[in-house]
Regions:
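Short beta-strand-to-loop acidic/aromatic patch adjacent to the donor-nucleotide binding site
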Residues: 13-29
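Short coil/turn segments at secondary-structure boundaries
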Residues: 1-3, 32-35, 56-58, 77, ...
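Conserved donor-nucleotide/metal-binding helix-loop-beta segment in metal-dependent transferases, i.e.
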Residues: 28-53
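Amphipathic alpha-helical interaction motifs in eukaryotic regulatory proteins
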Residues: 4-11, 45, 73-79, 93-98
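Active-site-proximal specificity loops/subdomain of glycosyltransferases
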Residues: 1-16, 51
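A recurrent flexible, glycine/aromatic-enriched loop bordering the glycosyltransferase active site
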Residues: 49-67, 74
Length: 123
């Protein structure tokens, strides 16, 4: 639900065209990682150290994700049915798929992410 609140407040400040949803405990290992929105939604935290730099499952869209305001609006944002940790990102992946949007994935060194243990609240 806080992702939707963040969106609502952010679009009041400026006419943004790109949104990046970023878990606070994930830190990119390469500072050349560009926080931009391509033509399709992009999952940016593909290779997380916690998962041995492997994508845990195909439908993952959590951690760090970039999506255009147009696509976010098209899928009506994140579901407000989830409280606490987990589930909202998988639901978003399904929402994107239902609108025939394809999740793209950043690959190579730019996709490497480390979980900052001092910031992790769960897991």
């Amino acid at each position: 639900m806080l992702f939707n609140v963040g969106y609502s407040e952010t679009v009041k400040l400026f006419d943004w065209d790109c949104l990046v949803f970023h878990d606070v405990d994930l830190l990119p290992e390469d500072d050349r990682n560009l926080y931009t929105c391509p033509d399709q939604p992009r999952h940016m935290s593909v290779a997380v150290d916690k998962f041995n730099y492997q994508l845990p499952y195909k439908g993952l869209f959590g951690g760090v994700s970039a999506i255009s305001v147009q696509h976010f609006t098209l899928v009506n944002g994140f579901s407000n049915q989830y409280w606490g940790w987990g589930g909202e990102d998988d639901d978003m992946a399904k929402r994107l798929g239902s609108q025939k949007l394809n999740i793209t994935r950043q690959c190579g060194p730019l996709s490497l992410v480390e979980v900052h243990r001092g910031l992790a609240l769960i897991g």
